[in-house]
Amino acid sequence: MTVLTHRPEWRALETHYHAICNVHLRQLFAEDPGRGERLTAEAAGLFFDYAKNRITDETLRLLIALAEACDLRARIDAMFRGERINATENRAVLHVALRAPRGAVILVDGANVVPEVHAVLDRMAAFAEQVRSGRWTGFTGKPIRNIVNIGIGGSDLGPVMAYEALRYYSDRNLTVRFVSNVDGSDFAEATRDLDPAETLFIVASKTFTTLETMTNARTARAWALAALGDEAAVARHFVAVSTNAAEVAKFGIDTANMFGFWDWVGGRYSMTSAIGLSTMIALGPERFHELLAGFHAMDEHFRTAPFDRNLPVIHGLLTIWYANFFGIETVAILPYDNYLKRFPAYLQQLTMESNGKSVTLSGAPVSYQTGMIYWGEPGTNGQHSFYQLLHQGTRLALCDFIGFAEPLNPLGNHHDLLMANMFAQAEALAFGKTTEETLAEGTPEWLAPHRTFAGNRPSNTLLAERLTPATLGALVALYEHSVFTQGAIWDINPFDQWGVELGKALAGRIVPELMSESAPHLAHDSSTNALIRRYRTLRGRVS
């Protein structure tokens, strides 16, 4: 296969970059009055304005030519057909099947998986309705008032993001908490004010062996039994999202209350699988299906829309443009909606675990930059924190602004103030303020350099009518498919995560060295050995 940087389409982009890299957005807008209306796209309730990027129509044409040369369309079709595109694990990648409508046909190894998906969704809905209605009671007969999801990675980040994003639509009679960190403080604080007799734990681990999750699950079991006293209580206060029936039963959970999913669902793509059980309980099945419908609408748009009108494709190609030609290393996710406060953290896993790779699908080292670093904070908080660097720092960051026209909680003029700030920040980043403009305002000449804004800092804006379950589904799917687009261009596998394995293996070796009663024989590097000895000394253990 041709190396990416040797492709004529890549070299054409390099030539084009050198021709336009110093052109200011002020000039691009001045020379093209229709730019703001033309460089937009819309699908699944999302309006995507990408006019404030350092591109021309020719840039987009060349990026699409690169996508076509890299067989992006064929790769998209292969994913939707259920081919084993996760080559390193020999798995299909079919999170899109999780939100397919009941009558759809999506095959894996010749079998339609959609009926299985809906069978699990139906079981989830029945259980969620039991909990929400009070028909599911705890061991003492009290109804469940508290839901605690125990998971980590994709078993936590998706559910907690979805719950926080859609909290407005949730049943406020239920308290929903999340425990992920193996740090005991996470569990202690999550359960401090809960009544065990009214608490249901959802233990989310496909294998039911994940270290952090099962450590927290065993602690939760002991916490519940300390109050309830009878081993039989476990079956009324714990359910599992897993495929390991033997371990689930050994824990004391009734396997009738085990909700499974499939090896063609990656953890960071699993929030619409049984991993979303806590979301369904909080929102109710009807709202959860609205979430699925939003995902599916964007899935179909990605699958069928021409690349020049395809939101995820354009978004992904713009990321390639900045990562590989401008050398930008970070993307700031800036949601102007406080309900999306966990969205940047969710995207960190989705993007960085997917595309944080340094070898191609064939195992050859890449000779170009791959995954970007994602971070962010809701507006307007970030404006009083890190926006200074975005506006006047020496580093370029790509910014994604996300906003909604209608507030969920209309209070006075709060929402107009919020959205005015979002539009203003994108405008200020793009166009800045010249020294001449600063001086014309009466600024002293000595102060003018400090109050000048270079501008020419790129951003995207995503705008929707309001934050709904369907809108959230479309938004998440847009980023999922943008990640896929980037991975296809870079010729890497966005669906494995071998990078998490080495640290886990080393930790398994260090645990007994920290806990042993006698001084352990240490054979690490001198720094790690010294840190272990210092830790043992501080814990009062022989070192």
Swiss-Prot record:
Entry keyword set: Cytoplasm, Gluconeogenesis, Glycolysis, Isomerase
Enzyme Commission number(s) of this protein: 5.3.1.9
Catalytic residue positions: E353, H384, K504
A GO CC term assigned to this protein in UniProt: cytosol
Top-rank EC class of the record's enzyme: isomerase
InterPro entries cross-referenced by the UniProt entry: G6P_Isomerase (IPR001672), G6P_Isomerase_C (IPR023096), Phosphoglucose_isomerase_CS (IPR018189), SIS_dom_sf (IPR046348), SIS_PGI_1 (IPR035476), SIS_PGI_2 (IPR035482)
Gene Ontology molecular function, alphabetical: carbohydrate derivative binding; glucose-6-phosphate isomerase activity; monosaccharide binding
CDD domains: SIS_PGI_1, SIS_PGI_2
GO biological process: gluconeogenesis; glucose 6-phosphate metabolic process; glycolytic process
Gene3D superfamilies from the UniProt entry: 1.10.1390.10, Glucose-6-phosphate isomerase like protein, domain 1
PROSITE patterns recorded: P_GLUCOSE_ISOMERASE_1 (PS00765), P_GLUCOSE_ISOMERASE_2 (PS00174), P_GLUCOSE_ISOMERASE_3 (PS51463)
Reaction(s) catalysed by this chain's protein: alpha-D-glucose 6-phosphate = beta-D-fructose 6-phosphate
Pathway(s) the chain acts in: Carbohydrate biosynthesis; gluconeogenesis; Carbohydrate degradation; glycolysis; D-glyceraldehyde 3-phosphate and glycerone phosphate from D-glucose: step 2/4
Subcellular location: Cytoplasm
Annotated coiled-coil segments of the chain: none
Keyword match Lipid metabolism: no
The UniProt record lists the keyword Cytoplasm: yes
Domain of life assignment: Bacteria
Annotated family: Belongs to the GPI family.
UniProt-listed NCBIfam families: PRK00179.1
Described purpose of this protein according to its UniProt entry: Catalyzes the reversible isomerization of glucose-6-phosphate to fructose-6-phosphate.
Protein name listed in UniProt: Glucose-6-phosphate isomerase
Organism whose genome encodes this protein: Roseiflexus sp. (strain RS-1)
